[in-house]
Each structure stands twice: as C-alpha cells, then as structure tokens.
Amino acid sequence: MYVLAIDQSTSGTKAIIFDEKGGIVHRVTVYHKQYYPKPGWVEHDPEEIFRNTLDACRKVIEESGIKPLEIEALAITNQRETTILWEKKSGKPVYNAVVWQCQRGASLCEEIKKRGLEGKIKEKTGLVVDPYFSASKIRWILDNVEGVKNKAKQGEIAFGTVDSWLIWKLTKGEVHATDFSNASRTLLLNIHELRWDEEVLEIFEIPPEILPELKSSDSVFGYTDLGFLPKKIPIVGVMGDSSAALFGQGGFYSGDIKVTYGTGSSTMLNIGEKPNVSDSPIVCSVGWVVKETSSYVLEGNIHSAGDTIVWLKEKLGIISDPSETEKIALSLENNGGVYLVPAFVGLGAPYWRSDVKAAILGLQRNHGKEHVVRAALESIAYQVRDIFEEMVRISSKEPTEVRADGGITRNRFLMQFQADILNIPVLVSNIEEVSARGVAFVALLHLGAFSDLEEIRQKITYREKYEPRMGDELREMYYEGWKTAIRKLLTE
C-alpha cells in the first residue's frame, strides 16, 4: 500500500510516494516560474502548476519502480492564500494565480480598516485584514479583469486556493471543494461555525456563487486517474502546507508548536478544539478537521525567511549558494551590532505593516559581507521569537520544545541561534517534506494503515536536537538590538 502526495509550494511542485508506515519511497520536484509584474506583486501560472503536478506524479511513479496499481490514494498539501479564479465551463483561469506574498490588495484592506470593520472581521474569521489573505486578491481580480465580475455573479466563475484548483483539474471539473484549513486562510470563513460568512462576503463584495464546498481534511474529495493510472484512486488528505506540517510533526495536542522555515515562515501553536480570537495581531485558524474533530491553531507568518537568503544570492551577489551562509555566520564571534529587517514585502506577524520597507541597521566601516549574511540568518530567528512571545501571552501555554522543519533547518548556525534566542530546545525533523508527510498520514489513517493519531506520533523521529546554550544577558542584548531596529522602522 502506497500513498502519492502532492506538495504544491511557492517555488515548485513535489510528488512524493509514501509507504504504509509514512516513510518516503521516492520524490520528484518540478519548479515553476515566478512573475513579478510590478513592485510588491507576485504571480504564478495555474496551468503551468497543473502541468508540473502531472509531470511530477508521472516521473515519481516511473522512477520509484512501484506498480501504479499499488498506489491507493492521492493526498494534497499546498501553498495557502494564493488565489485562482477560473471559468467553470472551460476550466481556464481568468488571470494568473495571485500569490500569498502579493501586496496588490493593500489599498482595499486599508479602506476596510478605515471603515472600522477590522474588529468585526477578526472576530469572525480569526484573521487580520491584510493583503496576505485571499479576500482582497479575489476582489482585485473581480475588479480588474474584464467581464469576470458579471460572470461571477451569474455563477460562471469558480474561486479556489491551489488545492481547489488541482482537485477541480484532477477530477475533470466534477469537484469544486476545499478543506477547512485552506478555507480558514481566505479571510472569508467563519471559524466558529465553520461556514462561509455572508457578512464578510458582503464587505469584500465577493459573490458566494464562486466559493468551493467545505470538507474535512480526511474526506474523500473525489477520484482521479491522473490521466495515466490504471484505476481511479481517491483524493483524500487535503490540508494547507503549514497545518499539514504541524500534523506531519505529530503536533496533535494542545500546546504543541512547530516552525516551518520556507520562503516565508509559519509558527503554529495547537490550541485545541476551540478557537481563541483576541485583539492580538496573531491570527487564529483551523488547523484541520480530522475524525470529526476540529483542531484550532494560533499562527504567525513572516514574509521572508528562506527568501532573505535567496536575496543575498540573487540580488546582492554576496553568496553563490545558500549553504555557504552557515560557515560565513560562524566565522564571526558576534553580530557586530548589525541587524537586517527583511521587510521586502512589508512586515508580517506580529506587526502586519505592509508599508514598511527592508533595511540594514548598524553598519559601520569595519563591517563586511559576513555581517550582512549573519544578520540575514539572525533575522529569521528574531521574527520567530516575536511571534512566539505573543503566542505565549495570548494562550497562556508555555511550550517546552519547538518542532522545526523546512529546507533551511540544515543550517546549523540558524537552528542553534533559534534555540538560543527562544531559550528552549529545537527538534529538527528527519525529513524536509513534513507537509507532504502530514497529508500522507491523513490518507493512511483513512485507509486503515494507522488506528489513531497516537500511533502516528510514535512513528515520528528527529534528525537533531539543539539545546539552548547562550547566557541570559547575551540573549536579551541581541534581542533588544532587534527590537530597537524594528522600532526605528515602525516609527519612520
């Protein structure tokens, strides 16, 4: 028994085959193009993403040597918030996918805030009014692509996050659905009642006719043969990437916390079966609905984590490969008072300031590129602590360890600095593809390979454990330097 998992991320699409114990058999990655039509705008081509998905699935099966008949289910995890609208009749997108990083909805969000509606929306959806989430992206497409608004009102247009788009295409238009974790990131879901909220839809002027059906992550979302399998298999195990990462790390219980380090970063705390919506900028979302039980999470997202390292390479040209940053950072005894605030598309949680620009502070004549590299790595850890402290304040939960995943967890400097700056141990996943493993676990649970969540948790092991070893005085000195840098930018 095998499960094929699709992990559709910001940079590319992975197809991964898991065995019945949740172990990786084989993986294939296909990257897609990034489009930046204007400063602060980011787009993907939905058709390219679907083609790449089919290519990755075909290749991973061929290269693995597994018989196609042995694959029992298809699971999907995806970049969240990214918004696609398409014609129901033709299945063709009306515009490119507007990516989660894209800031084009900023003016609409500001207008809604000025109308005094943010509190009401936060209470219902658990989210802050920000262009990061799907609602303002949907509205932009409706307002700016000719003819789409009228077609939407007539029920001819479908909206979906990437999971919905793939499910629609894989089922040849038979199923238009999403799961609650993805829906809760649109800024349109009432997280208390688990339904689309009519009042919020009216505020954003979004017709309900375009919305997908809501399903639990362990529902069967339809059937597909991917265009080449000898039989149709169920699509089961659908979850947004950050929720899937928490699930894949075994974060099933209240108080469990994980940090996913990707292009951006997601810090997510399981808070149990009831939402906790506060006036804090930390958002509350649906982690998942599995076995008819809802798990809610507090989440803080930062826009630039791995993306900051890519910037060092592609724009500054001071590294030729991201792996060099570890050695460069370790060559310094300290940070020299240099701080990089990577607000390339504004600041995410807990500040939510889309107007702030990136800056390097504290540079002096004796500083070199190594100080900038170290400051870039440190910025990731500081942003995670900003979120962590706010989560502890809201939830009154004191996590005793952090589960970490994502490509840059291989950077030993960053992981040790993260443990030091949080002052709790960091457990690093033994695989990078924890989001895919999360949805594979859901599919395997559905197929009967596991009896319950605890059995899954016992299967999870970690590659490394980083214990904090920095003194209290030094820790707080570093962190206060970061807070000072942030204050300067926020008050400019």
Swiss-Prot record:
Annotated CDD domains: ASKHA_NBD_FGGY_GK
List the catalysed reactions.
glycerol + ATP = sn-glycerol 3-phosphate + ADP + H(+)
Tell me the residue numbers annotated for binding ADP: T10, K14, T263, G306, G407, N411
> Where does the chain bind sn-glycerol 3-phosphate?
T10, R80, E81, Y132, D241
Looking at the UniProt record for this protein, which Gene Ontology cellular component terms does it annotate, in alphabetical order? cytosol
GO MF: ATP binding; glycerol kinase activity
Query: Where, in this chain's numbering, is ATP bound?
Result: T10, S11, T263, G306, G407
Its UniProt pathway annotation is: Polyol metabolism; glycerol degradation via glycerol kinase pathway; sn-glycerol 3-phosphate from glycerol: step 1/1
Amino-acid positions noted as binding glycerol in the UniProt annotation, renumbered to this chain: R80, E81, Y132, D241
Q: How is its activity regulated?
A: Inhibited by fructose 1,6-bisphosphate (FBP).
Q: Give the Enzyme Commission number.
A: 2.7.1.30
Keyword line: ATP-binding, Glycerol metabolism, Kinase, Nucleotide-binding, Transferase
What's any GO biological process attached to this entry?
Answer: glycerol metabolic process
- Source taxon at top rank: Bacteria
Family (UniProt):
Belongs to the FGGY kinase family.
What function is annotated for this protein? Key enzyme in the regulation of glycerol uptake and metabolism. Catalyzes the phosphorylation of glycerol to yield sn-glycerol 3-phosphate.
List the protein's name: Glycerol kinase 1
Organism whose genome encodes this protein: Thermotoga maritima (strain ATCC 43589 / DSM 3109 / JCM 10099 / NBRC 100826 / MSB8)
